[in-house]
């Protein structure tokens, strides 16, 4: 390939550019003296030159050199689509930059208009003020490069001058002005290798400038070919060559959006990020999520679950899916893209009192002050069964699999088959109202570093206003019914084959109980808490400290602690390995009726209209959720949320921030109870003179 060039001028050297010479009346800042022998020969001698656009004989665009009568432009007459950079402005970073040439520091200035077309440009290389004169008493020359590839060395700067304006005063008498003919009319072939050599000899900044000017004369097809070749070479894979541990450290600092964006960079990155499943485990913990029974079954379908579940008990490989499930569940509740659906239906409740509410699978179970137990379908609202047998109000109810156990003001405990809607067993023995119930089933736990299972069989424990607790065996589904006639003979009911023993010790009504495995915690109006081993009836601890009645207790088996809330407005955390009080939590202004624990947080509800969240490890308060007025009648919580009822409304809170997200229900006369599962919230409420069950479905479909 050969190109044409202009012959070299004897009086001045040339460099390839397409820029007019800068003519400025302002002298340059004096630098160090200039020695032509140390300046690059490629800039002083014109033996290797880049061609101008109008010198490329082989370009078919040169057939027409006029556009709308303008014959002075060196750019061929073409449309802007074919030549995308034809009218593009020179980027600012190409117009002003610094260069170091042969130990001389130069500031390169382009003084042509930013929107100049190719062929209309000029450059000056101005020596910098802070250059030390080391080579000569004379300062370095200002180098001016014009559009016809000529270089002008200006020696008009005095090194003794004290005033150094920013740009040079250039004598244009020895230069060729824009638009004039080359010095010689003789043309000779210019070898492509010499063009490349000249380009390589240019300073980096001028290379970039010159290359952009060439691109302005390239058509779209040529630019596309260049892009296709260059783009892959300019990309550098910053992950593939790094050690696994460093990549992991980088990824753990990304948010989810950035992490997912990285997966789209390339198939290689996608494969790398697929391997780093520990990222999802890290995010799982960062979001405050906790694995549950379903997660364990998903990851270990053939293994028995450990006594207590922790995030590190499941392999990292399963966490992408586990995180997704928890994250979407949180989003459905806290930030739903589809508004939750709402099903409301009235229920018949004499005296308008719903004493308890349970959401069990697709069934809603309610008990009332009339003694009836109703089972409604949670999807349709249809009444599926009405369990009748208690003579007075039912104040306590528990469920285990297909068995429902109820305790009543009529002093009896009844056992029901849910599917058959039938009472199978009646237990008598208490001489006053049954106020609380618990079902304890064989559970795996760690004691003294050894994994054990206790108790050896399921038990029912009932607490009564007669100051006692009674322990019964939980009947099996295959056991025959036990339905003795009513009698006033207490001795006869002591012979009940399901009766185990009576727990005696409290001196006032047993108000609340909580248990796990073989351990039961009871709270009484006698202001004390007792810890029992259910299978033997032994009282392990008698905990004193509260000054008034106990309204709520909670047993936390993993930490081996229990928590009590009292009418004295305080909460106490007890260490059951020593029987001592660890913390006294104060802040509520009324009696504490509700307690719940999740992970390291204790949540308490009080008649002072507030919900408080505490750090269970330190006993320090974390936040207060104010609820206007009215005592907190009910609340439920999990790793994402708190749902509370008071002040005529049901509210949804973010458990991590304490922020009130929305009102689920408003304009209520009374809220008795709330409950929820993975997809639904159910509330038993009263509007005016009618009781209702409200089902709010967050699954994105009609309940």
Swiss-Prot record:
Keyword line: Cytoplasm, Nucleus, Repeat, Ubl conjugation pathway, WD repeat
GO cellular component: cytoplasm; nuclear SCF ubiquitin ligase complex; SCF ubiquitin ligase complex
Record protein name field: WD repeat-containing protein pop2
Organism domain of life: Eukaryota
Ranges for region Disordered: 1-73, 156-180
Any one GO molecular-function label of the UniProt entry: ubiquitin-like ligase-substrate adaptor activity
InterPro entries: F-box-like_dom_sf, F-box_dom, G-protein_beta_WD-40_rep, WD40/YVTN_repeat-like_dom_sf, WD40_repeat_CS, WD40_repeat_dom_sf, WD40_rpt
Species, as recorded: Schizosaccharomyces pombe (strain 972 / ATCC 24843)
């Amino acid at each position: 390939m050969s190109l044409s060039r202009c012959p070299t001028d004897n009086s001045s050297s040339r460099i390839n550019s397409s820029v007019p010479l800068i003519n400025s009346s302002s002298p340059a800042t004096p630098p160090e003296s200039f020695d032509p022998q140390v300046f690059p020969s490629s800039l002083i001698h014109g033996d290797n030159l880049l061609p101008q656009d109008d010198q490329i004989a082989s370009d078919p665009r040169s057939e027409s050199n006029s556009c709308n009568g303008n014959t002075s432009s060196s750019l061929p007459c073409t449309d802007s689509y074919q030549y995308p950079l034809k009218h593009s402005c020179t980027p600012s970073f190409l117009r002003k930059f610094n260069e170091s040439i042969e130990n001389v520091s130069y500031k390169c200035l382009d003084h042509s208009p930013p929107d100049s077309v190719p062929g209309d440009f000029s450059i000056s290389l101005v020596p910098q003020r802070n250059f030390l004169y080391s080579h000569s008493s004379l300062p370095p020359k200002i180098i001016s490069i014009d559009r016809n590839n000529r270089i002008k060395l200006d020696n008009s700067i005095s090194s003794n001058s004290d005033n150094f304006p920013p740009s040079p005063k250039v004598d244009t008498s020895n230069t060729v002005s824009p638009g004039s003919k080359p010095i010689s009319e003789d043309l000779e072939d210019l070898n492509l290798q010499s063009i490349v050599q000249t380009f390589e000899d240019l300073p980096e900044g001028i290379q970039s400038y010159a290359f952009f000017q060439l691109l302005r004369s390239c058509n779209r097809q040529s630019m596309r070919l260049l892009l296709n070749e260059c783009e892959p070479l300019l990309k550098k894979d910053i992950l593939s060559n790094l050690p696994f541990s460093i990549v992991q450290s980088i990824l753990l600092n990304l948010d989810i959006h950035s992490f997912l964006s990285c997966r789209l960079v390339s198939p290689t990155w996608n494969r790398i990020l697929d391997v780093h499943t520990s990222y999802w485990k890290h995010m799982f913990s960062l979001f405050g999520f906790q694995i549950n029974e379903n997660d364990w079954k998903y990851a270990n379908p053939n293994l028995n679950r450990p006594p207590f579940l922790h995030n590190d008990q499941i392999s990292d490989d399963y966490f992408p899916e586990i995180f997704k499930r928890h994250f979407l569940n949180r989003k459905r509740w806290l930030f739903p893209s589809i508004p939750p659906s709402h099903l409301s239906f009235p229920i018949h409740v004499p005296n308008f009192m719903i004493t308890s509410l349970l959401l069990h699978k697709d069934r809603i179970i309610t008990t009332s002050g009339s003694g009836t137990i109703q089972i409604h379908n949670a999807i349709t609202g249809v009444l599926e069964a009405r369990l009748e047998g208690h003579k007075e109000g039912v104040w306590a109810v528990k469920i285990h699999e297909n068995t429902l156990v109820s305790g009543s003001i009529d002093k009896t405990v009844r056992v029901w088959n849910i599917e058959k809607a039938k009472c199978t067993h009646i237990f008598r023995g208490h001489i006053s109202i049954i106020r609380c119930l618990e079902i304890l089933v064989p559970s795996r736990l760690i004691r003294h570093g050894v994994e054990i299972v206790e108790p050896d069989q399921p038990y029912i424990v009932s607490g009564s206003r007669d100051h006692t607790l009674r322990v019964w065996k939980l009947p099996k589904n295959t056991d025959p019914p036990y339905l003795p006639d009513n009698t006033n003979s207490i001795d006869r009911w002591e012979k009940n084959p399901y009766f185990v023993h009576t727990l005696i010790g409290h001196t006032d009504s047993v108000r609340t109980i909580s248990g796990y495995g073989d351990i039961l915690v009871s709270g009484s109006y006698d202001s004390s808490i007792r810890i029992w081993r259910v299978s033997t009836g032994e009282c392990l601890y008698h905990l004193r400290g509260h000054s008034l009645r106990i309204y709520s207790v909670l047993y936390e088996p993993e930490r081996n602690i229990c928590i009590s809330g009292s009418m004295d407005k305080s909460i106490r955390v007890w260490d059951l390995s020593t029987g001592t009080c660890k913390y006294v939590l104060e802040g509520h202004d009324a009696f504490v009726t509700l307690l719940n624990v999740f992970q390291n947080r204790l949540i308490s509800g009080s008649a002072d209209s507030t919900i408080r969240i505490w750090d269970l490890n330190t006993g320090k308060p974390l936040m207060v959720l104010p609820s206007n007025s009215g005592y907190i009648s009910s609340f439920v919580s999990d790793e994402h949320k708190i749902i509370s009822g008071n002040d005529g409304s049901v509210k949804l809170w973010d458990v991590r921030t304490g922020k009130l997200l929305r009102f689920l229900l408003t304009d209520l006369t009374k809220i008795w109870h709330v409950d929820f599962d993975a997809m639904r919230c159910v509330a038993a409420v009263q509007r005016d003179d009618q009781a209702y069950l409200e089902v709010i479905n967050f699954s994105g479909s009609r309940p």
